[in-house]
């Protein structure tokens, strides 16, 4: 499980954009988003934390890695 906080994720549009960015990189990933805590949890199938963070950044957001447990 890879967890990011994304403070500039504030609405459903933001969460959808982040989900799409993650799934473009890793189509089999499972993404859970909690808007109230600005938390993005990703259970990746193929991508690593660096790649996922880069994908979220490319989508226009500022991810901060919280944890990257296997």
What is each model feature region?
Residues 1-70:
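Flexible metal-binding regulatory segments at protein termini and peripheral loops
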């Amino acid at each position: 499980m890879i967890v990011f906080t994304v403070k500039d994720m504030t609405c459903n549009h933001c969460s959808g954009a982040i989900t799409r960015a993650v799934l473009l990189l890793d189509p089999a990933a499972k993404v859970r988003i909690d808007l109230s805590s600005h938390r993005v949890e990703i259970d990746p199938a193929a991508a690593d934390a660096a790649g996922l963070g880069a994908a979220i950044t490319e989508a226009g957001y500022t991810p901060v890695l919280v944890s990257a447990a296997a």
